Amino acid sequence: TKKGKWSEVFGKDQPLYIEVGMGKGQFITELSRRNPEINYIGIERYTSVLYRALQKRELLTEECGEEFPNLRYLCVDAKDLPNFFGKGEVDRIYLNFSDPWPKERHARRRLTSREFLARYEEILADGGLVEFKTDNRSLFDFSLEEVKESGWELLVCTYDLHHDKELMEGNVMTEYERKFS
């Protein structure tokens, strides 16, 4: 297992950022291109979606000659993250346009539920961050409440990311975000 040994996998002891539910991988690939001093891991639970991300990465490598040595992928369910990362090993977690699981009986499946926040707490380094973007107001409100109830500190909050100059600076848009915003 690579748990606690991701620096060895990358061959460089650098901060580790992960994206949970990376979809087609545009966001995390662009981040890895812009920030070679950070190691990135894209997490996707569906092999078919992960395969599409790998194809896109290959195409970029062929077209641009970029290798993305600071980017890896994991095909796992987010509930299993503590089995793949050591305590304090992850410096940042990105949650971008996650499935809102709109039915109340599915609330525990939301990636911002207390159960998931507890899992993230296990793997986040001291001072580690979770960055969350959604266009679903119900999920947003639910997430704010879960953060509060879990005793987490909310550093920045906006209801309109794309009209906030300060937050948009350096924002990498996901494929979904580009399409629908």
Question: How would you name each of these model-derived features?
Answer:
Residues N83-R92, F97:
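A short acidic, Gly/Pro-enriched loop at the edge of an enzyme's catalytic core
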Residues T112-D126:
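A short glycine-rich, Lys/Arg-flanked "PGG" loop and its adjoining helix->strand segment in the class I
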Residues D126-T134:
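Conserved beta-strand signature within the Rossmann-like core of class I S-adenosyl-L-methionine
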Residues G23:
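Conserved glycine-rich SAM-binding loop
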Residues S143-E145, E149-S181:
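Class I S-adenosyl-L-methionine
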Residues T1-I18, Q26-R33, R57-K87:
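S-adenosyl-L-methionine
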Residues Y46:
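Conserved SAM/SAH-binding beta-strand->alpha-helix loop
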